[in-house]
Curated annotation (Swiss-Prot):
Keywords: Disulfide bond, FAD, Flavoprotein, NAD, NADP, Oxidoreductase, Redox-active center
GO BP: any one term: response to reactive oxygen species
GO molecular function list: flavin adenine dinucleotide binding; NAD binding; NADH-dependent peroxiredoxin activity; oxidoreductase activity, acting on a sulfur group of donors, NAD(P) as acceptor
Cofactor requirement: FAD
Protein's name according to its UniProt entry: Alkyl hydroperoxide reductase subunit F
Amino acid sequence: MLNADLKQQLKQLLELMEGNVEFVASLGSDDKSKELKELLTEISDMSPRLSLSEKSLKRTPSFSVNRPGEETGVTFAGIPLGHEFNSLVLAILQVSGRAPKEKQSIIDQIKNLEGSFHFETFISLTCQKCPDVVQALNLMSVINPNITHSMIDGAVFREESENIMAVPAVFLNGEEFGNGRMTIQDILSKLGSTADASEFENKEPYDVLIVGGGPASGSAAIYTARKGLRTGIVADRIGGQVNDTAGIENFITVKETTGSEFSSNLAAHIDQYDIDAMTGIRATDIEKTDEAIKVTLENGAVLESKTVIIATGAGWRKLNIPGEEQLINKGVAFCPHCDGPLFENKDVAVIGGGNSGVEAAIDLAGIVNHVTLFEFASELKADNVLQDRLRSLSNVDIKTNAKTTEVVGENHVTGIRYEDMSTGEEHLLNLDGIFVQIGLLPNTSWLKDAVELNERGEIVIDRNNNTNVPGIFAAGDVTDQKNKQIIISMGAGANAALNAFDYIIRN
């Protein structure tokens, strides 16, 4: 089931195992069970430290990743290929005794959790957000014997996942726990365990402190570190919104990559320099005093720096119409690559006629029964090549001059109301899912009145990435820079870094 290149890479990784690992599989006579047995046999034959046995488990087909004679609580229900293959490889290494790369403070938080925690995560193999959650919960299961975790492929267990309309969907002890991408710190926080502010008490002031973790942040950090400046990053996750991007084909010199691969490479590049990257935590306030610029974190800790570069990026913009908020993850979705497979053979709408919306409609047309694309303007704004491709599809309708007015449904989406602005007529379209692709909203709510914002909530900057507050710079999608592209954000981050360096020299 694995191609030659992947087998070679896997064989090298399996050499890092520090102890024996046993696959315990629950198999039936169905085709998926046969595929799973073939995969596990193929992997087991690649290392003398791996073995395979069979036992009836809660779900079939499924398998646990155990130590000989010891259950770890790590289970995969389905066949973990696609984006989840890395989750399987990591689970093998961690169960074998390979030390995780998490900070000791995080490991201690996991060990100190009290109670029994039985997690189940519904995923799709095309979901780019899912592996982060699966890998975090698997690691927690390996570290704490009171935690178990099962990854469940919704495409294999359709009856069980029938009402799951967004992935990853995490359940704890049978109750809904969370949806969407979560870091290990996010999960711990939801369980009531937060990073101690004392961890930050002894940090010396920075020359440059960068808030945010996307392309602009990474670029700025590398540039300032190369100038010999003491550099820190405060970020929820390295890569930012790029983590949720499926394919990247316009990053010059790299013909094709994925958002997750790009983010992984960015993190590795940051690690090559003396940069204090503090991830899994967010900033909540910023203040300039006579002594320093002070950034307050969500755990109450305060960091000081001579300069700050704000690069907090942007998140999905919502429709802000009745019914939308209540039905997010219940039919209202933002990631077609993640959640599209959950709507197989169903009718969906895509809201937005730009490149993102048209690309989403094209992708979904290959999965769902029918796509209706809504655009507020009189014509689509996407590139012509994308529009031509969209119009060639037989199961897509395009509605322009269409103002969406209400998401309809109680426990899940059943339809959408819209106004035909050319006639003033109201219409109801019955459907099962709505994918919102109307642009991004800058992550600036935490700034309050600290720096000048425009009417769209973007930070106002000049050509040198200065804000209206000396010493505070901004870069990337959080700013009023017109074009929002990865490569432009990276250039902006470098520009902000060089001007922060110049500011420090002159002040």
